[in-house]
Every structure is written in C-alpha cells, then in structure tokens.
Amino acid sequence: MKSFTDLQEGLYDPNIFKAFFLAGGPGSGKSYVVKKSTGGTGLKIVNSDDIFEKYLAQAKLDFKMQSSQSGERDVQRARAKKVTDKRKANYIEGRLGLVIDGTGKDFGKISSQAAGLKQIGYDVHMIFVNTSLEVALANNKQRKRVVPEKLAMNMWKQVQSNIGKFQQFFGPKNFIIVDNDMPDLDGRLFDHVFKKVKALLSRKVDNWMAKAWMNKELKLKQR
C-alpha cells in the first residue's frame, strides 16, 4: 500500500505517465546522454548497471569481465536486476515518469515492456543513442566496466538492426535519435535533445486510463 507521500509524488509528479526507453550499445555514451537530456526533469532512472557495478566491487570481481568469473558475476547481475525490478515496480505503481535504460538489442523485450506501459495509460517514447562501430569500440575500452570486444561488436550490430523497428513501433514523433559520434563541444546537440524531451513531457495526459487512475487516486487522497 502506498504511503501518503508516495501518493502525492505520483499524483502531482509533473511527468506522470511518461516513459522514455533508452537504447544504445556498449560505448554509445548512454549514461552521459541521459544526464544531459533528462537532467532536472525529475524522471526516475531505471538502470541496473550502477547497482551491478556496486555489487561487483563489493564482491571484489574484475571489471574487465573475465570469463573465469562469469559464474560469480551472474550472481551479482541477478541481485542487481532484482533490486532494479523492485524499484521499477514501485515507480510504475505511482505512475511516475521513467527513463528505462537498456541496450536495445532485444526489440521484442522492449516493445513488450512499452506495450504494457501503454496499456495502463503511459505515453511511451525512445531516445536512441547512435554511434559508429569504431567510436563505440573505442569508448568501450575507456569504460569502467569493459565489455569484451567481440560481444560489444555483436551487441552494436543487434542494436543497429533494430533502429527501423523501434522507429516504427514508437512512431517518428516519439523517437529521438542522438548521433553521439563527435564530442558536443558547444552543447548544441544536447540542448536540441533536451528541448525535444521537454516538448514530449509537456504534452498533457490525455489517455482515458491515465485520467481514470488520477481521478481514483485523488478521491483516495481526499478521504
């Protein structure tokens, strides 16, 4: 059962019923893009990577992702996913605005999640962070947690193969591509992306399911 504070946060969240799916392979710079394009909006970030890396450090496992540690690493990944899924469920229960971080390699998984959110009244969008393979591999080597190069290449190819599918699923007006090959030295790129995100967030909630939920929660609050 939600507390009074949780109820208020959901009902009066300025970005209620808004969800942004983030796609981009290892080395695409997704975390930086999220910070620059959604920072200050109050959207809740759903990302198991930070928790996973915390658990890796606690277990004293190598961030170079050595194959000899795959079993122990999978245990920590499962722990991180469990915590993240619980947080996500709590956010969704309050219908809070979300940024759901992922690689985008599995179109079926993301489209299924997005469809589920749409069924309860969410507006769903995607921010697709695009880079060349060369840039992605170079950036991957500079990451704290390095993905093996062969795996990074395969993931990049999988993500790239889904661009058209994602654009068709979310629709051109709800699909933002960020070309992140070159450094955004003057800030124009991220300023442009931020404005696009803000424009999507500013759309009024018009879904009947969302409105019904809001009316129900308001009545509960007034009791």
Task: Report the location of each language-model feature.
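Conserved glycine(s) of the Walker
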Residues: 29
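Short hydrophobic/aromatic beta-strand immediately N-terminal to the Walker A/P-loop
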Residues: 19-21
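Proteolytic processing junctions in secreted/extracellular precursors
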Residues: 2-10
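Conserved phosphate-donor/acceptor-positioning beta-strand/loop module used by diverse small-molecule
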Residues: 118-139
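Phosphate-binding P-loop
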Residues: 10-17, 90-92
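Conserved GTP-binding G-domain of TRAFAC-class P-loop NTPases and closely related GTPase folds
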Residues: 133-223
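The conserved Walker
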Residues: 25-26
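Conserved substrate/cofactor phosphate-moiety recognition/catalytic segment
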Residues: 32-96, 108
